[in-house]
Design a protein with these regions (language model features):
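Residue-level detector of alpha-helix initiation sites
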Residues: 12, 16-17, 21, 156, ...
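N-terminal glycine-rich phosphate/pyrophosphate-binding loop and immediately adjacent elements
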Residues: 2-128, 287, 297-299, 303-306
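Classical protein tyrosine phosphatase
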Residues: 20-54, 119-122, 260-286, 425-430, ...
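FAD-dependent oxidoreductase catalytic-site/capping-region signature
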Residues: 3-8, 124, 130-180, 185-187, ...
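Glycine-rich loop(s) and the adjacent beta-strand/alpha-helix scaffold that form part
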Residues: 29-33, 40-44, 50, 224, ...
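Short loop/edge segments at beta-strand edges and connector loops
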Residues: 217-219, 285-287, 486
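Conserved redox-cofactor binding core of oxidoreductases
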Residues: 106, 111-231, 235-237, 301-326, ...
Length: 542
C-alpha cells in the first residue's frame, strides 16, 4: 500500500450492533490501533435516546439507509420499506429495543449445521458478558455487562394481552431469555434509566477516549483493498467527496449489516463471478453464495379500536395528552415515551408436535394504515387504536441482496421473496387465528370497542392470507446473506473468516445461518463479542 496511507492494525466497517462491540473490545488492548468507519452521523439526536422518538428517525435519511424491496409477488407486488441504521450504533439506534436472545435449541442447530462452536453452551458466556439484567437466574443472565436490559412496565393493554394469552392456554413465563424460551410475558428491552441503550452508548461511549481508537463518521466504505488474496485495508469516500484509504496490518472487519455487507463484498471482488463482471468489478474470489440465502421475518397486524385512551394514537390526537406524557417522561423516564410501542409478547407453538415455539406474538400501542406513520395525516388511525401481530420465527422463504452499482451509496437490490413458501403461508394463517382467539378472551375483549382491520367475520384461511398479503411488512430482521457454514455453500467459516481470502472477517447478522428466535439485535451484539474473542485468540496464537 501507499506509504502515505494511514495505518492501523484493525479497520472496522460499520458501527452497528456488532461493529461497535468490536471497536470497544479490540481497543481494550492498548498495543493495537483500531479505526472504526461509519457512514452516518453521531447518535446525538434526542430522538435516539427517547425510545418513542424512533418514529422520527426511521423516515429520515440522515439517520437511516432508506431502501425498499423489489415488488413482492406474494404481497400483491407491494414494495416494502426497508430502513437500516446509519449512525453510531447502527440499527441498535433505530430498532424496537426488544431484547431477545433466541431459543437455545436453535443455537444447537447452528452447531449441527457446520458451525462448530456455536451451540447454546458456546454462546451463553457472550450473552451473559454483554448484558446487565437484575432479574433472572444468575446462571444464565449477566449482571455486569454494558447493555442494560429491563422488563417493560405493564400498561393496561400489555397486561391484558399477557393475561389473555394465559386464558387461551399459553403458559406465562418470567424470563423468556432463560432456558424456557416459551410463553407470554412483558417484553425485555435494552433500556438504561428509561433511555435507549444502543451499542454506541453501551460500548463506544466508554471507549471513545482511548488513544488507540479512532472513530470516523460520514464516510462511505467503497471497497476492501487486497494485496493478492489478503485484505490489507479499506478505500472510502470522505465527507468532502475525496477518496481515501486506510491500511489494516492485521485484519479488516466487515460489520455493515445483512443489507450492506454482501454489497460491499461484491464491490470488493468477492461474489459470483458473472455478477461481478456485469458490475465491472475485478474478481478477487468467486463465491456465488454472497448475497444469497436471505431470510427475514414478515408480520401481519390485526387492528382494533380501544375503549380507553391507552395508546400512542391518543398522544397524536391530543396536544394536552402529548404534553402530559412528555412531562411524565422527562421527570420520571416512565410512560409511553419510555417504550417503542411494544410491551407484551408471547412465544408460541402454532400446532401440536413442535419441539419449540415457531411464532412470536405481540401487542402494539398503535394502529393505522401505514406502519411507520407518525401522525394522523400520514396514516395513524384517528381514534384510540392498537394492534396485535405476529410472525413465523423460522421462515422457509429465501431471497437475495446484491449490488447494482459500483457506488456504495446506492442501495442494493433487495429481494426477500416474502411468503413465497407454502409453509410460511400456513403458519401465518395459524398464528393470525391465534391472535383472533387472544382478542376474544375476557382479559382482552373488555378493552376492545371493535375490530377495524380486518373486520370480524373475515376469519377464513383464504381471507386471512389475503389480508396478510395486502398488509404485511418487514420486522427488520434480515440475516444469512454472508452466512456461516461449510465452504461449499457459505461465505464465512465458524470463526467468521471469509472463505477464499485472508485478513477479512464478517461480523454482523449477515453471517447467521438461519433465524434463531425473533429479534436479531441482541444475537448480533453477541456475534460482536464472539468476533472479538476470535480476533484476540488469534493475536495470542501468533
Amino acid at each position: 500500500m501507499n506509504s502515505q496511507v494511514e495505518k492501523y492494525d484493525y479497520v472496522i466497517i460499520g458501527s452497528g450492533s456488532a461493529g461497535s462491540v468490536l471497536a470497544a473490545r479490540l481497543s481494550e488492548n492498548a498495543g493495537v490501533k483500531v479505526l472504526l468507519l461509519e457512514a452516518g452521523k453521531p447518535d446525538t439526536s434526542p430522538f435516539v435516546r427517547i425510545p418513542l422518538g424512533v418514529g422520527k428517525l426511521l423516515n429520515d435519511d440522515r439517520y437511516v439507509w432508506r431502501a425498499e424491496t423489489l415488488p413482492q409477488k406474494n404481497l400483491y407486488d407491494n414494495k416494502i420499506y426497508w430502513p437500516s441504521g446509519k449512525m453510531l450504533g447502527g440499527s441498535s439506534s433505530v430498532n424496537g429495543m426488544l431484547a431477545v436472545r433466541g431459543h437455545p435449541k436453535r443455537f444447537d442447530e447452528w452447531r449441527e449445521a457446520n458451525c462448530p462452536g456455536w451451540g447454546f453452551d458456546d454462546v451463553l458466556p457472550a450473552f451473559m458478558r454483554l448484558e446487565t439484567y437484575k432479574e433472572g437466574n444468575p446462571a444464565f443472565r449477566g449482571k455486569s455487562g454494558p447493555v442494560t436490559i429491563v422488563k417493560s412496565r405493564p400498561n393496561p393493554l400489555s397486561a391484558a394481552f399477557v393475561s389473555a394469552c394465559g386464558q387461551t392456554g399459553i403458559p406465562l413465563v418470567d424470563d423468556y431469555n432463560d432456558l424456557v424460551a416459551e410463553g407470554a410475558s412483558q417484553m425485555q428491552m435494552n433500556l438504561h434509566d428509561g433511555r435507549r441503550c444502543n451499542t454506541s452508548f453501551a460500548y463506544l461511549k466508554p471507549a471513545r477516549r482511548r488513544h488507540n481508537l479512532k472513530i470516523v463518521t460520514g464516510v462511505f466504505a467503497r471497497r476492501i483493498l487486497f494485496e493478492g488474496m489478503r485484505a490489507v485495508g479499506v478505500e472510502y469516500i470522505a465527507p468532502d467527496g475525496v477518496t481515501k484509504s486506510a491500511g489494516a496490518s492485521a485484519e479488516v472487519l466487515l460489520c455493515a449489516g445483512a443489507t450492506r455487507s454482501p454489497q460491499l463484498l461484491e464491490l470488493s471482488g468477492i461474489g459470483d463471478a458473472t455478477r461481478l463482471r456485469e458490475l465491472g468489478v475485478p474478481i478477487v474470489h468467486h463465491n456465488p453464495h454472497v448475497g444469497e440465502h436471505l431470510q427475514d421475518h414478515v408480520m401481519p397486524r390485526l387492528n382494533y379500536e380501544c375503549v380507553e385512551p391507552y395508546t400512542v394514537n391518543d398522544l397524536l390526537r391530543s396536544r394536552l395528552r402529548m404534553g402530559r406524557e412528555l412531562l411524565r417522561y422527562f421527570f420520571s423516564h416512565q410512560g409511553l415515551f419510555a417504550t417503542t410501542g411494544i410491551a407484551g409478547t408471547a412465544f408460541v407453538r402454532t400446532r401440536a408436535g413442535l419441539a419449540y415455539p415457531d411464532a412470536r406474538l405481540q401487542v402494539g400501542l398503535t394502529s393505522g394504515t401505514a406502519r411507520l406513520a407518525t401522525s394522523i395525516k400520514t396514516g395513524i388511525d384517528d381514534f384510540s387504536g392498537f394492534h396485535i401481530g405476529g410472525y413465523f420465527l423460522y421462515p422457509e422463504s429465501r431471497g437475495s441482496i446484491h449490488a447494482i452499482s459500483k457506488d456504495p451509496r446506492q442501495s442494493p437490490s433487495i429481494q426477500p421473496n416474502y411468503l413465497s413458501h407454502p409453509v410460511d403461508q400456513e403458519v401465518t394463517v395459524r398464528l393470525m387465528k391465534m391472535l383472533r382467539k387472544i382478542a376474544e378472551q375476557p382479559a382482552m375483549s373488555t378493552l376492545i370497542k371493535r375490530a377495524t382491520r380486518p373486520p370480524l367475520g373475515a376469519d377464513g384461511d383464504e381471507e386471512l392470507l389475503d389480508y396478510a398479503r395486502k398488509t404485511s411488512s418487514t420486522c427488520w430482521h434480515p440475516i444469512a446473506t454472508c452466512r456461516m457454514g461449510a465452504e461449499v455453500d457459505s461465505v464465512v467459516d465458524s470463526r467468521m473468516r471469509v472463505y477464499g481470502v485472508s485478513g477479512l472477517r464478517v461480523a454482523d447478522a449477515s453471517i447467521m445461518p438461519f433465524q434463531v428466535s425473533s429479534n436479531t439485535n441482541i444475537p448480533t451484539i453477541m456475534l460482536g463479542e464472539r468476533a472479538a474473542e476470535f480476533v484476540k485468540q488469534d493475536i495470542a496464537r501468533y
